[in-house]
Every structure is written in C-alpha cells, then in structure tokens.
Regions:
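Hydrophobic h-region of N-terminal signal peptides that target proteins for export
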Residues: 2-10
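C-terminal/domain-edge helix-coil "capping" segments
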Residues: 9-29, 130, 134-201
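Short low-complexity stretches enriched in small and charged residues
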Residues: 16-21, 46-56, 119-123, 193-197
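N-terminal segment of the mature soluble domain
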Residues: 30, 36-105, 162
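Short, low-complexity, polar/charged sequence segments that are solvent-exposed and flexible
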Residues: 50-55, 83, 113-116, 166-171, ...
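Glycine-rich loops and low-complexity Gly/Arg-rich segments
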Residues: 56-60, 86-90, 118-123, 172-178, ...
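Surface-exposed short loop/turn segments
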Residues: 75-151
Length: 201
C-alpha cells in the first residue's frame, strides 16, 4: 500500500530554473504558449492549462493552436511564426518540449505482514496469529519524461531567452493529471522568479 500511495502522489519535480540576469524588460502583456511535441490533443491540453495558469489582469496568455493548427509530427514554419508574433503583438513566447521520455519496468517483490500478537483474549490471539497478509509481487511500469520550458522576449528580432525551467515528470495516473501537476510546478516557479506576478487571491 505504501508503494501505491507513493506512486499516486509522485509527480513533476523542478530540476532547475534559470533567469536571465541581464533582462530588464518588465512584465509581459501578451504571451504565446507553444507546445512543440507530443500528440495534438495533449499539446492543446497543456497549452490550455498553462494559459489559464499564467494569465493575469496585467498580461494575458494565448494557446498557439488558436493561430497555428498542426497535425502530429508537423513542423512549424518559422516565417509564419515571425509574422504571427508581429501581427498579434506578442511580447513573449513560452516554448515547451519533451526532451526525454522513458518507460521503465521494475519488479516489486511481495511482502508478508503480520499484526503484533495480542494474547489477552482468545479472539485477540486468534485474530493476531492468523491474519498473516501476503502481498504478491507485481511488475510496476513508470513513464518518466523530462520537460524543458523556455520563455523568450520578442523585443529583439531573434528573441531573447529570459527564463528556463526543466522538470522531471512522472506520469501519475493519466496524461491530464500529469499535465495539471506539471503546469502547477511551472507556474509556481515563474511566480517565484518574478517572471509573472503572483495570482491575486
């Protein structure tokens, strides 16, 4: 049960974050959120959740799929991207990509558990002696990925890297739950690093 509980709460963990010490452009007013790889449905879900999490009254975020529809494994035309950024006046772009995705399978051996004996009564003794619980071994599969998120200012023609965050992400039950946890971790760090203002309560 302990193993199952640990798996249930395991989730994305921030490995590192970096903020450009030379950046002094202030808060962003219009941010484009772009997920580079993965299935289209998962990209859209990630973009939607991150947009909702980082949008503020002082600056709003937008999912890229509202402007660029990409089937799976379709690259982005950089000329189109430049035109989009210029036409829509985006002052920042958040780019997320999965840099590593591994599936590991390990064997978790069974365990024998016996409650401490209680000899005061027959029923106590009997119930303590016989309910020896055996948990059979099982194969445990974990999907582990690394997600890199970069935020660029568009003030310069080729963009300027302002912030980077890298997470190790453990799939927790479903893709949707994993995305939700990932977005929460990223948003917390973006606030901590003063890239976006804290959410008003």
């Amino acid at each position: 049960m302990a193993c199952l509980a640990m798996l249930a709460v395991a989730g994305p963990k921030l490995e590192m974050s970096w903020k450009n010490p030379g950046y002094s452009g202030g808060q962003f007013k219009k941010i484009l959120v772009l997920a580079l790889n993965g299935k289209a449905a998962n990209r859209m879900e990630f973009e939607d959740q991150l947009v909702a999490a980082i949008s503020r009254p002082t600056g709003k975020a937008y999912p890229s799929y509202e402007f660029i529809m990409r089937p799976d494994a379709t690259p982005i035309d950089m000329k189109d991207m430049r035109e989009l950024v210029k036409e829509q006046n985006f002052d920042a772009i958040v780019v997320a990509r999965v840099t590593k995705h591994d599936t590991t399978t390990t064997y978790v051996p069974g365990q024998v558990y016996a409650p401490s004996p209680y000899y005061g009564t027959f029923y106590g003794y009997y119930n303590a002696l016989y309910p020896v619980v055996y948990t059979p071994g099982y194969m445990q599969t974990e999907r582990v990925g690394q997600v890199e998120v970069n935020l660029y200012s568009t003030a310069k023609p080729d963009g300027e890297l302002v912030w980077t965050g890298i997470t190790n992400t453990f799939e927790i039950g479903s893709v949707m739950k994993t995305i939700k946890s990932l977005v929460k971790v990223l948003t917390k760090q973006l606030e901590k690093d003063n890239i976006i203002p804290p959410q008003s309560k």
